Amino acid sequence: MTSIHSPVTRKEDTELKRPDLRGKFVCSSCSQNFQHSASLNRHRQLMHSNEHTCMMCERALNQKETIREHMRNEHNLAQVFTCGCCNWTFASKRQLTEHTKCIQGTGAPGDTIPIAKSINAPGSLIQSTIQGTPPVVKTGRKRPMGGSLSPSSSVSTSISSRDASGSPPPTEEEAERKVLFDNAVDTILQSKFFTYQQITEVDTWVKIIESANTLADTLQRIKKSQKVKAEGPAVESKMIPEKHVKQEIE
């Protein structure tokens, strides 16, 4: 396994997963240049992890641990989502999306509560802010057969939250379970059952995770049962009644 202190090897264009997104991406902490946004995000995780402070244990990370390792080992969070424009970290993808929309719309971080913050101000890691101009990116987009370029194929600065471990993609059942868990965490947080101070405490997150897992397992069992019986309305997994959340937490 590569040491966390080893220099980040720069890949050739042919080795990049998306060579069409090659451009100039600058690290705001050390001014090192990268040809791909994913390489810059990985560099930040490996070389500047000590810029993070965990809001759950109020401890600054050291350079020997990444934010993902810290959340997994110290707080039992198997997956977290880090914003590429400020390196704030959130417990669910939905929270990251809400935070990103606020940054893009108003320049403010919004009301979504992160589980870890960095020394970087919200939006300060956006390449147009660092470089003073939008990053130069070679699109290299391919024209679909018999049609024009799709608007959805436009290129923007990547905000990556994927782990670069090379793990196999999750199964359909695992992906569904993850969605149910994320929705449960979101519902618990949005229910305002806990105060802001409580959310920064480890014991609170242990309760949140246990409750979210229980809710996710219950919903998944119900969905499986309904598929087998092939009757009755489908269970709505996107919203979880608040009364069930309170029952699980209490």
From Swiss-Prot:
Where composition is biased (Low complexity), the residues are 148-165
The residues forming a coiled coil are none
Disulfide pattern: none
Q: Which GO terms describe its biological process?
A: neuron differentiation; regulation of DNA-templated transcription; regulation of transcription by RNA polymerase II
Q: Where are the zinc fingers (C2H2-type)?
A: 25-48, 52-75, 81-104
What does the UniProt record report as the effect of altering S148L in this chain?
In ot108; defects in left/right asymmetry in the gustatory ASE neurons. Significantly reduced expression of LIM homeobox protein lim-6
Nucleotide-binding as UniProt keyword: no
Alphabetically sorted, this entry's keywords are: Metal-binding, Repeat, Zinc, Zinc-finger
Q: Does the keyword Hydrolase apply?
A: no
Of the GO CC terms on this record, one is: nucleus
Looking at the record, which segments are called Disordered? 126-177, 226-250
Q: What does this protein do?
A: Involved in regulating left/right asymmetric differentiation of the gustatory ASE neurons. Plays a role in modulating expression of LIM/homeobox protein lim-6.
Record protein name field: Zinc finger protein lsy-27
